[in-house]
Amino acid sequence: MKVRSSVKKICEKCKIVRRGGRVFVICENPRHKQKQG
């Protein structure tokens, strides 16, 4: 899980999701998981 100020899709399978006022990126590739913090 990477914590970044700006989250971006890295590949086509990345999805941007909002949970509890936070922005996450979920992907099949665990290295692409990101959180906005």
Swiss-Prot record:
UniProt feature coiled coil, ranges: none
GO cellular component: cytoplasm; ribonucleoprotein complex; ribosome
InterPro entries: Ribosomal_bL36, Ribosomal_bL36_sp
Keywords: Ribonucleoprotein, Ribosomal protein
Any Pfam family: Ribosomal_L36
Lineage: superkingdom: Bacteria
GO MF terms, alphabetically ordered: structural constituent of ribosome
Protein's GO biological process: translation
KW Ribosomal protein (keyword) present: yes
Ribonucleoprotein keyword on record: yes
Family: Belongs to the bacterial ribosomal protein bL36 family.
The protein's name: Large ribosomal subunit protein bL36
Organism: Dictyoglomus turgidum (strain DSM 6724 / Z-1310)
